[in-house]
Amino acid sequence: MRTNPTTSRPGISTIEEKSVGRIDQIIGPVLDITFPPGKLPYIYNALIVKSRDTADKQINVTCEVQQLLGNNRVRAVAMSATEGLMRGMEVIDTGTPLSVPVGGATLGRIFNVLGEPIDNLGPVDTSATFPIHRSAPAFIELDTKLSIFETGIKVVDLLAPYRRGGKIGLFGGAGVGKTVLIMELINNIAKAHGGVSVFGGVGERTREGNDLYMEMKESGVINEKNIEESKVALVYGQMNEPPGARMRVGLTALTMAEYFRDVNKQDVLLFIDNIFRFVQAGSEVSALLGRMPSAVGYQPTLSTEMGSLQERITSTKKGSITSIQAVYVPADDLTDPAPATTFAHLDATTVLSRGLASKGIYPAVDPLDSTSTMLQPRIVGNEHYETAQRVKETLQRYKELQDIIAILGLDELSEEDRLTVARARKIERFLSQPFFVAEVFTGSPGKYVGLAETIRGFQLILSGELDGLPEQAFYLVGNIDEASTKAINLEEESKLKK
């Protein structure tokens, strides 16, 4: 197989290198193209079909070389619809892989897999481009120090902390606050870490992608008046796109994130929604290319494809890419090859609970189901670890007692169990938090809570010092001092009512 240089050879203009082939066969999004002898393109090269269809309408289709078939023929996968293409049409080899715009000019904009803006705001003002196929950072470039990525969200930082440069799986159904949590993380990384975010919508519903964009504009994550001050770049490959586009859109988003890490030396947050759709698109392409399917009909190269994406998401000595990936689990089967392969790469899981959302506790992160490999005494320290374990024990005991309370009532519990329930209910409410991006809906100012403040707050609840305060004082507050202030205000209000 011919390897692909990511840039043109020195001293030779790209125009001189371009070779022209002709379409031989079209099967859906797969094109077979014949090139002159000695002019075959490299694997992963971008090919462009520019022509006019029978209605004299302009055709502009970009493809990516996937296989060299022999007899001067290559097989390529189209990145857009192939309607209007005919056998015999000219195909130009660009001589390089797909390259996309990178840098500060991408912030606040929406792109497709080819790096073309699709938000009707005109061309992107940047000359810098990166190829989407790049090697993972070398071992000597990696930052091996284990460090916590502070999000300012109490429940995450205390019970399932994120690793700087790690990968987090976000599990949640519709309507439990996934989008708001994503937007808050984008907002917090910009304010606390001076970082930026890249959102990759892989196989998303177009409606959801549009809703996310509108909500980001409403909450200020995307600044309409001054687009350069936006904190996020969006890359969409929706459900209606051909499988080639859905398979590569994750790499386009990752490439934009790599520029911020390697060139701007920033901490970057990369969202991929949904990582399952990346695997699904790869499976479709694999079948179209005639490969023999593997377990459950997935592509035989599943682990390799997943690894080539995930290994590029890491911390280097320059900066970090921390990735949050929404994971769809088909038929709730965790042993399915797609989620099973994803789990092997994750450092933490954040599980959103419909039960907590129905109680009005936001963020609705399940404190018992969410896990993290970072929650170890040698990484987070003994104080953090012990506080987190005691919080989990208290909540677990409350969960066990709920059936008894439902049948017999709270009065039938022992004094010790009643105290546990009271503290658990305070903890549950203190895990809620007002978000900056939700200010426009709730009217409550958002709060960023540092890790030390979070630990101090839960220690005070567990020690019993705050047993006299009412439960509602802990609901939707930032640090523990706000809870104490809220308790005084509630007491004064109740006196006035009397």
Swiss-Prot record:
Instruction: Write out the GO biological process terms.
Output: proton motive force-driven mitochondrial ATP synthesis
Q: Where in the cell is it found?
A: Plastid, Chloroplast thylakoid membrane
Question: Could you tell me what reaction this enzyme catalyses?
Answer: ATP + H2O + 4 H(+)(in) = ADP + phosphate + 5 H(+)(out)
Specify the domain of life of the species encoding this protein.
Eukaryota
Q: Which GO terms describe its cellular component?
A: chloroplast thylakoid membrane; mitochondrion; proton-transporting ATP synthase complex
Name which cysteines form disulfide bonds: none
Chief place where the protein resides: plastid
Q: Main EC class of this protein? A: translocase
Topology with regard to the membrane?
Answer: Peripheral membrane protein
- Keywords, in A-Z order: ATP synthesis, ATP-binding, CF(1), Chloroplast, Hydrogen ion transport, Ion transport, Membrane, Nucleotide-binding, Plastid, Thylakoid, Translocase, Transport
The EC number(s) this enzyme carries? 7.1.2.2
UniProt xrefs under Pfam families: ATP-synt_ab, ATP-synt_ab_N, ATP-synt_VA_C
Q: Which Gene3D superfamilies match?
A: 2.40.10.170, Bovine Mitochondrial F1-atpase, Atp Synthase Beta Chain, Chain D, domain 3 (1.10.1140.10), P-loop containing nucleotide triphosphate hydrolases (3.40.50.300)
Q: Which residues form the signal peptide?
A: none
Q: Give residues annotated as binding ATP.
A: G172, G173, A174, G175, V176, G177, K178, T179
The protein's GO terms of the molecular function aspect are: ATP binding; ATP hydrolysis activity; proton-transporting ATP synthase activity, rotational mechanism
Instruction: Tell me the SMART domains matching this sequence.
Output: AAA
Instruction: Show the CDD domains listed in the entry.
Output: ATP-synt_F1_beta_C, ATP-synt_F1_beta_N, F1-ATPase_beta_CD
Spell out the subunit comment.
Answer: F-type ATPases have 2 components, CF(1) - the catalytic core - and CF(0) - the membrane proton channel. CF(1) has five subunits: alpha(3), beta(3), gamma(1), delta(1), epsilon(1). CF(0) has four main subunits: a(1), b(1), b'(1) and c(9-12).
Q: Which family does it belong to?
A: Belongs to the ATPase alpha/beta chains family.
Which PANTHER family does the entry link to?
Answer: ATP SYNTHASE, ATP SYNTHASE SUBUNIT BETA, MITOCHONDRIAL
Q: What does this protein do?
A: Produces ATP from ADP in the presence of a proton gradient across the membrane. The catalytic sites are hosted primarily by the beta subunits.
Name of the protein described by the UniProt record: ATP synthase subunit beta, chloroplastic
* Species this chain originates from: Zea mays (Maize)
